[in-house]
Amino acid sequence: MKSNNNPKTMVVERYTITDRIAHTVHAIAMIVLIITGLKIYAGWEFMSFHTARTLHMIAVPFLLAVNWILIPYNIFSEGHGLMGKISHFVDHYIFGPKDLARLVGIIKNFFGKGEYPAFTVYDEKTGHYKTKLHPLMKILIPLEGLALFLITVSGIVLYKLDWSLFGLPVAQWIISISGMIAPTFGMTPVGFLRVLHLLMTYWFIFELVVHVGILEFDPRVWKYYKAIFWSGKEDLSDRHFVEVARNNPNHLPDRELWRDPSDKPSEVKE
């Protein structure tokens, strides 16, 4: 992470170029898949079935490559050594006690009690973020991973009933496993997979609404859109949602970071 030398600002790299590529491709591919998938299912008239299916199949490898190759690379390229990488993964992507405390604070703030806690924590000493994600996103991410796996597995069968990989009858294996579950719901194996595929589509729509329409509907969060899609930078002097951990006895707690920047600095007591 790099910061500039202007004492009035503290600009650091929040997202690398590969982070931005991954997020942009993921967003575009997901939107294309949702729209074309619902067109195929519902029969909307704004494009032909052939066009929708073609666009759908083009977007699939992009989504899978980003989520199963590029994003894991981005995650585990951080940290030094095996334990450092594991520590980075846990701190940044696993919902823990500190995230629970932040989430409770966010819920209280929603009901007008208390301030909105900082969910971005930057360590000035190490020059790295301790955590960047909204606590609710740390809950949604593993659920998204599961949903992506299920929609891929069901999609293989919907694409081709006898699809195979290197001679292995993958689609038939999936149908066989589905056949163990489907009778419980009074469905055929393929019918169950079709419903599962549709339900996962609705999940991704729900996640999109939560991610964009609720968590980040606050204009003060829009700075992160510019960072994730374009600049990759964050100015930590903008204290909304941000805490800077300083290696000195005057480290400001979250409540102090929410002061009006025009106010005079108050004395921080240990």
UniProtKB/Swiss-Prot annotation:
Signal peptide: none annotated. Keywords: Cell membrane, Electron transport, Heme, Iron, Membrane, Metal-binding, Methanogenesis, Oxidoreductase, Transmembrane, Transmembrane helix, Transport. It is a multi-pass membrane protein. GO terms for cellular component: plasma membrane. The keyword Nucleotide-binding does not apply. Its cofactor is heme b. GO terms for biological process: methanogenesis; respiratory electron transport chain. It catalyses: methanophenazine + H2 = dihydromethanophenazine. It is found in: Cell membrane. The chain crosses the membrane at residues 27-47, 57-77, 139-159, 173-193, 195-215. It is an enzyme of class 1 (oxidoreductase). SUPFAM superfamilies: Transmembrane di-heme cytochromes. GO terms for molecular function: metal ion binding; oxidoreductase activity. Its EC number is 1.12.98.3. Its main location: membrane. InterPro entries: Di-haem_cyt_TM. Induction: Expressed in methanol-grown cells. The keyword Heme applies. Belongs to the HupC/HyaC/HydC family. Composed of a large subunit (VhtA), a small subunit (VhtG) and a cytochrome subunit (VhtC). Part of the F420 non-reducing hydrogenase II complex that catalyzes the reduction of methanophenazine to dihydromethanophenazine. This is F420 non-reducing hydrogenase II cytochrome subunit.
